């Protein structure tokens, strides 16, 4: 049975929702500091201030519709080598043509950029970005930034 609760809810011992009386005794700030989200943000924050975060990611993911813009921006900013695992996949496999894909030139550009800058190139028709990142790159507690078109 599912019970709908409105407003903020506090979980006690990862098991039950606190009563109104129990919840009133809990500091909202302390409760927030005990969340998984807070712990991940704290681990990746490189400032001394949790109000003004300076996040450093563990990995990065890029897919074919965003390759060119991301790579050109990175190179224009002086990037020589990716400072973290950077995966390039080909999510738009439905754009197929006889003998390849409509995006073949973009895929070749990304593959050469990966060889030049130390990225990980996943060939067309092998994986989509979210799947590859989840299965091969990101582990519990990591923070990854991944491009998307929507």
Predicted regions and their residues:
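Fe-S-dependent hydro-lyases/dehydratases of central metabolism
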Residues: 1-150
């Amino acid at each position: 049975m599912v019970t709908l609760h409105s407003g903020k809810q506090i979980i006690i011992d990862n098991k039950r929702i606190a009563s109104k009386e129990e919840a009133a005794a809990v500091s909202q700030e302390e409760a927030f500091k005990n969340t998984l989200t807070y712990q991940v943000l704290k681990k990746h924050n490189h400032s001394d201030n949790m109000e003004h975060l300076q996040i450093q990611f563990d990995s990065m993911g890029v897919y074919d519709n965003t390759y060119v813009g991301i790579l050109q921006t990175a190179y224009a900013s002086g990037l020589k080598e990716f400072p973290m695992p950077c995966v390039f996949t080909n999510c738009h496999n439905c754009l197929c043509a006889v003998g390849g894909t409509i995006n073949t030139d973009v895929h070749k550009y990304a593959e050469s950029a990966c060889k030049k800058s130390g990225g990980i190139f996943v060939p067309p028709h092998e994986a989509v970005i979210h799947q590859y990142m989840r299965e091969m790159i990101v582990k519990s507690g990591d923070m990854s930034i991944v491009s998307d078109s929507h």
